[in-house]
């Protein structure tokens, strides 16, 4: 992504500036946060992941773009304080919603995926 944006590996300031765009929801007009009760384990965390995937697919069907942002979990204390969430809640992620900027170079990125048969076995 950084190469696509013309940000050299050694330009730490530019890399940090790009990362910080997470915390502006990449300019999206709408966003939300997802919390999980601290007592919940991996099954409930995966439930939330499946819910988010479904939400993202439904948003796409409605002509909207989304970006799941795990980066927000690093800001748990700040977000929890601002939203006045309970002590039992832990921030899982944020998600921004809107229409992608077709002119933004970063939105042309299509990361390579390993072929299905290299990571999945069907029996």
How would you label these PLM feature ranges?
Residues 1-123:
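Acidic, surface-exposed loops and disordered segments
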């Amino acid at each position: 992504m950084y190469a696509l944006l013309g940000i050299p590996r050694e330009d730490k300031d530019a890399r940090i500036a790009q990362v910080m765009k997470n915390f502006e929801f990449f300019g999206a007009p709408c966003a939300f946060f997802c919390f999980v009760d601290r007592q919940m384990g991996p099954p409930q965390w995966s439930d939330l992941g499946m819910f988010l995937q479904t939400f993202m697919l439904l948003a796409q069907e409605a002509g909207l773009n989304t970006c799941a942002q795990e980066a927000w979990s690093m800001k748990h204390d700040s977000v929890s304080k601002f939203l006045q969430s309970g002590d039992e809640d832990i921030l899982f992620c944020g998600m921004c919603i809107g229409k992608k900027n077709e002119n933004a170079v970063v939105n042309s990125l299509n990361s390579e995926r390993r072929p299905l048969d290299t990571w999945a076995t069907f029996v």
